[in-house]
Structure formats: structure tokens, C-alpha cells
A protein has these predicted regions:
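Short glycine/proline- and charge-enriched loop/turn segments
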Residues: 19-28
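Conserved donor sugar-nucleotide recognition element shared by glycan-biosynthetic enzymes
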Residues: 13-14, 154, 182
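Mobile amphipathic helical/loop "lid" adjacent to a hydrophobic cofactor/ligand pocket
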Residues: 25, 36-159
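Helical element adjacent to the flavin cofactor pocket in flavoenzyme catalytic cores
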Residues: 159-220, 226
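N-terminal Rossmann-like dinucleotide/flavin-binding domain of flavoprotein oxidoreductases
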Residues: 31-50, 186-196
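Glycine-rich FAD pyrophosphate-binding loop
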Residues: 1-20
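Glycine-centered tight beta-turn/hairpin loop motif at sheet-sheet or coil-to-beta transitions
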Residues: 22, 66-67, 221-223
Length: 309
């Protein structure tokens, strides 16, 4: 078995960097959390590798218009972190609509062609529910602009929320994270592979994959071409399609249909990007600056909370 890796390190999305006040704190900047209910295979892998797992804190908060409106979902204290929201009819209607949506959305979204916009009309929720709860929450989940959410398939959203127990106020799956960062499982997996005589080639980008009768040919950036009995691609759909020298029509259709949203990620310690009201500080924070004029979504992952730092 030969493992081709274009980067000079293993892990891909599992990327741990050393940061912190004293420069000795491992922080994940890619793969961060999982749960046993929705990720049985990776849970089995971690158990097999004897990776140390610790609980994560999975909370959501939102800040709008530079802090004019803020709330969190961790507790009643964070929901009404801004005490004036308890006397704001639109905010209270939003909370009522959350319960209404959670109880009706699954039964209403049986039509696979229904969009989220159509679903909200069927359920009959307010604009505050859409603008200050559902779209920020789903935007945080998929890191995509809220403006694109209206046309998003309702069925995909509801299935995700159902699988992750987000259609109820309680009973969410316990989030888990790797003690010491995801680098720990990458290192153990590397050791396991090497013990089984897997040849690992770092910094060896594959440029083309060709199928020749009963063999598969791989050509790397160095011009080297080798034949293998089988090839497994652990790459994004668009990357996979670009690697195939002779993709079938089915491969073109299937792989080409998957779209991605580009995002920039910055590891920092700037508290000004957190909510003004500290009771709203959460593991995931959706934020909109004052007089927002960009379609880009701004999210802050509070790593101290997510990784128990």
C-alpha cells in the first residue's frame, strides 16, 4: 500500500497548531468535534487507536448590529443575557417560533423539492425567527452566507437537525474532542500504518489518474507514473474530478454537482470579536458588525470552550 499526500504533513482537515499565551497550547483549526451517535466509524477508529477523548461544550450564541441584539442558547441566563429582550415582543415571538418550528418542520417538509423559504411559509414563522435564529444557526453549521439559505433544500436541513437532535431544546448529543488536539490521532494512525508496511509519501501531489484495463495509473507532480491494482481517493469531489483523466458521464454528473463555499480562517485571541455581553459567549458565535454590508458570514469558534482549554 502506498499513501500519496500532497502536503508535507499528514492529516488534511485534522490540523493542530501550537498557540496560546506561552506558545505551548495545541489548538485545532480543522476537525474539532464529533459525537458517538452521528460519527460511529470515526468513534470506532479512535477507540481502536486508544485516543484520549474528552467532552466538548457545544453552545451557540449570536450578536447582531455590533451587539445591539445578542443572545445565547446555553441557558435562560444566556437567552435573556440582554435583560431588555424579555420585554421585546418580537424576541419573545422568535422563541415561541423556535418551539413551533421544532415540532412541525419534519412533518411539513415531506416534499423533497421544498426549499427552506417555502418551509418557513408553511410553518408560519416570523421574520425574526428567520433572520435572528434559523439562518444564523444554519449559517454557523455550514459556514455559508445566510442569503443563500432560503433556496437551500428544506429536507437536507431537517434531516441534519433531526440527526443532531437540534429539533428539541434538550437531548442534544454530547460533543467530544480529542485531548491534545487531532494531531494525536493522526500520529497514532501514522504509526499504525507504518507498522503495517504502508509507504507514506509526503509532499507528493498526484496530478493525474488513468484507468488502463485492469490497472490504475497514477502520475505525480514529479512526472513519475506508477500502476496499482486499486486506488482509493480521499479527496474533495471537485479535486477528485480534476484528477481523473477519463471521467465517465456519471462521475462528471455526480462529482460536478457538489458545490463548496470558500472561507478564511484566522486563529486569534481578539476578544473584541466576541459578543459584547459576556453571558452570550458560546462555542459558536454568529456575529454581524454594525451596518453590515457584506454577504460573507462571520463566525467565531471559541476554542477555549470547544476544546476545554
Amino acid at each position: 500500500v502506498v499513501w500519496f499526500e500532497s502536503e508535507k504533513r499528514l492529516g488534511g482537515h485534522a490540523r493542530t497548531v501550537t498557540a496560546g499565551k506561552y506558545g505551548n497550547q495545541p489548538v485545532d483549526t480543522g476537525f474539532i468535534v464529533f459525537n458517538k451517535a452521528n460519527y460511529p466509524n470515526i468513534t470506532k477508529l479512535f477507540n481502536d487507536l486508544e485516543v484520549k477523548i474528552v467532552n466538548s461544550n457545544m453552545t451557540f450564541g449570536a450578536s447582531f448590529d455590533g451587539g445591539r441584539l445578542e443572545y445565547g442558547l446555553a441557558s435562560l441566563n444566556s437567552v435573556f443575557a440582554q435583560r431588555q429582550n424579555a420585554f421585546r415582543p418580537k424576541f419573545l415571538r422568535m422563541l415561541k417560533d423556535i418551539t413551533k418550528f421544532n415540532s412541525q418542520a419534519e412533518s411539513v417538509s415531506k416534499n423533497s423539492d421544498m426549499s427552506i423559504e417555502q418551509l418557513l411559509k408553511e410553518v408560519g414563522t416570523s421574520s425574526w425567527f428567520k433572520d435572528y435564529y434559523l439562518f444564523p444557526l444554519t449559517g454557523a453549521i455550514w459556514s455559508m452566507p445566510v442569503e443563500q439559505m432560503e433556496s437551500f433544500p428544506a429536507e437536507a436541513l431537517i434531516n441534519f437537525m433531526k440527526n443532531h437532535a437540534l429539533l428539541s431544546m434538550t437531548g442534544q448529543h454530547q460533543g467530544l474532542t480529542i485531548s491534545g488536539g487531532s494531531i494525536k490521532y493522526v500520529e497514532k494512525l501514522e504509526q499504525r500504518m507504518k507498522s503495517q508496511n504502508v509507504e507514506i509519501r509526503l509532499g507528493c501531489k498526484v496530478n493525474k489518474i488513468s484507468r488502463n484495463f485492469d490497472k490504475v495509473s497514477i502520475k505525480t507532480q514529479f512526472g513519475l507514473e506508477e500502476e496499482f491494482d486499486e486506488v482509493v481517493l480521499a479527496t474533495h469531489a471537485d479535486d477528485t474530478l480534476s484528477l481523473l483523466a477519463d471521467p465517465t458521464e456519471h462521475e462528471k454528473t455526480s462529482l460536478g454537482a457538489i458545490q463548496y463555499q470558500e472561507n478564511d480562517a484566522v486563529l486569534h485571541a481578539d476578544q473584541s470579536l466576541m459578543p459584547v455581553t459576556k453571558r452570550v459567549w458560546s462555542s459558536w458565535v454568529y456575529s454581524e458588525s454594525k451596518n453590515k454590508n457584506s454577504k460573507r458570514i462571520d463566525l467565531t469558534y471559541w476554542m477555549n470552550s470547544l476544546q476545554s482549554i
